[in-house]
Amino acid sequence: MNTYAIIDTGGEQLRVEPGRFYDMRHFTLLNPSILDSNTKVLIYRVLMIHHESNIALGDSWLEDATIKGRVLHSHFKDKITIYKMRSKKKMRRKLGYRLNLARFVVDSICFDGKEFYK
C-alpha cells in the first residue's frame, strides 16, 4: 500500500508518508520551548493525498484531510556561511546563521473519516 500526502508548511512543500520522520523549518511561530518531545501535531494544509490508485487534489487545500504526527525533538542545522566581497573595493563581509529545525514523525494520514497507517 503506497500512501503519501503533499503538505505545505514552513514555506515549502513536503511529500510525507506514515511512519517516516522529517525536518521542518519554521514549524511554529510560537516559542520553540513549546515543542517538547512527543508533542502531538495536526497539520491541516494538505495539498494532495495519494492512496493506492486514488488521487485527491484540493483547490488550495483539501477540506477533510489532516496529518497526525508528533514532534521528536528540535535541533539546529549546520551553520550557513555567507561571504560577500567586492573586488578592488576592500569590502568584505562574513555572516552566518543556523536554522532551527523540528524533527517530527508522521503517525497517520486522515481523509474523509478514514485513517491510513503504515
From Swiss-Prot:
Keyword terms: Chloroplast, Plastid, Ribonucleoprotein, Ribosomal protein, RNA-binding, rRNA-binding
Molecular function, one GO term: structural constituent of ribosome
The keyword NAD appears for this protein: no
UniProt xrefs under SUPFAM superfamilies: L21p-like
GO cellular component: chloroplast; ribonucleoprotein complex; ribosome
Localization per Swiss-Prot or TrEMBL: Plastid, Chloroplast
One GO BP: translation
Function statement: This protein binds to 23S rRNA.
Subunit and interaction comment: Part of the 50S ribosomal subunit.
Similarity annotation: Belongs to the bacterial ribosomal protein bL21 family.
Protein name as catalogued: Large ribosomal subunit protein bL21c
